């Protein structure tokens, strides 16, 4: 069994304490066992739909889907894949907002298992620590690689960064298109959903909140 990093353990514990962890049930299956089980179920689904798995275009589809689920689009369910995070002392005494905009985000709606596609915007005001900029992108992508609802995803990213940076002064905004709305049901191809989660001074200080929201429009 792969041991988890200190950062992964801290973040998981924080999410569990706040009731923000993705609904999970522990099982003893390793990655290979999960892939084999999913492949068998996917094969049964395709056969139920009447698809010919003897066709060379479809024969490997159950295997591809199983591998994609475990190794890629749902890899964020496994904290062993939590990114290696570099947090360093704020020696330059930076005390103004740092913002990373337009972080590409692809997730999966947990209600219909179809795509959520959008952009995340992250800001924080350093206290004692700063984080490598690319690590923010990786943390966003880690939590996106799960079955998700956008509201929880936004809050998970917020709490993870608050935990790692040792400050409440973090703000997150996500704007995304949901294919459960675009490709089925109401079939609305133009709407999108925006969620925001604010902590610390971004929540309590109107000027700081306004600075963050203005930064989203630039």
Curated annotation (Swiss-Prot):
EC number from the UniProt entry: 3.5.4.16
Any GO CC annotation of this UniProt entry: cytoplasm
A GO molecular-function annotation: GTP cyclohydrolase I activity
Alphabetically ordered keywords of this record: GTP-binding, Hydrolase, Metal-binding, Nucleotide-binding, One-carbon metabolism, Zinc
Listed PROSITE patterns: GTP_CYCLOHYDROL_1_1, GTP_CYCLOHYDROL_1_2
GO biological process assignments: one-carbon metabolic process; tetrahydrobiopterin biosynthetic process; tetrahydrofolate biosynthetic process
Highest taxon listed in the record's lineage: Bacteria
Pathway entry: Cofactor biosynthesis; 7,8-dihydroneopterin triphosphate biosynthesis; 7,8-dihydroneopterin triphosphate from GTP: step 1/1
Catalysed reactions, as listed in the record: GTP + H2O = 7,8-dihydroneopterin 3'-triphosphate + formate + H(+)
InterPro entries in alphabetical order: GTP-CH-I_C/QueF, GTP-CH-I_N, GTP_CycHdrlase_I, GTP_CycHdrlase_I_CS, GTP_CycHdrlase_I_dom
Pfam families: GTP_cyclohydroI (PF01227)
Enzyme kind, highest EC tier: hydrolase
Annotated positions binding Zn(2+): 109, 112, 180
Oligomer status and interactors: Toroid-shaped homodecamer, composed of two pentamers of five dimers.
Family: Belongs to the GTP cyclohydrolase I family.
PANTHER family named in the record: GTP CYCLOHYDROLASE 1 (PTHR11109:SF7), GTP CYCLOHYDROLASE I (PTHR11109)
Protein name: GTP cyclohydrolase 1
Gene: folE
